[in-house]
C-alpha cells in the first residue's frame, strides 16, 4: 500500500505541527510554543517518520515548505544550528526506511494545512 502523508507546521503565537494521511483519514496536531515555521515543519516530518517507522508501506511525505524539503533532500544548506539538529534526527530516521520520498507541494495542495486549519 502507498501512504500519502501531508505535513504542516506553523510558528508564532499559535505554533504547532501535524499530519494528515490521505488514505486513512488519520490526522494529528500538536501545539508547540515558541517555535518557528521551519522548526514546526521539521517536527511534523520527524513525527511522521517515527510513527510509521515499522510500516512496510511505501511512504510519501508532502510538505509545502520548500526550504525544509530541499534541506532534507540535501539540495539546500542548513545554516541554523537548531534546524541542523532537527535535520540530523530526521536523516537518522530516513536511513531506516527502504521506500520513502519527501516531496514539496504548493500550499494550496497541502491537505494537512486544510485539515489542521493552518
What annotation goes with each model-predicted range?
Residues 1-39, 50-51:
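RNase H-like nuclease fold core
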Amino acid at each position: 500500500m502507498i501512504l500519502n502523508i501531508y505535513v504542516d507546521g506553523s510558528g508564532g503565537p499559535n505554533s504547532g505541527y501535524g499530519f494528515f494521511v490521505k488514505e486513512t483519514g488519520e490526522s494529528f496536531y500538536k501545539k508547540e510554543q515558541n517555535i518557528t515555521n521551519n522548526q514546526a515543519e521539521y517536527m511534523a516530518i520527524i513525527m511522521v517518520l517515527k510513527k510509521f517507522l515499522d510500516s512496510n508501506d511505501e511512504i510519501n511525505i508532502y510538505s509545502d515548505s520548500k526550504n525544509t524539503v530541499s534541506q532534507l533532500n540535501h539540495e539546500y544548506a542548513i545554516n541554523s544550528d537548531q534546524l541542523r539538529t532537527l535535520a540530523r534526527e530526521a536523516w537518522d530516521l530516513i536511513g531506516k526506511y527502504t521506500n520513502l520520498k519527501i516531496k514539496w507541494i504548493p500550499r494550496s495542495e497541502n491537505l494537512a494545512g486544510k485539515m489542521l486549519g493552518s
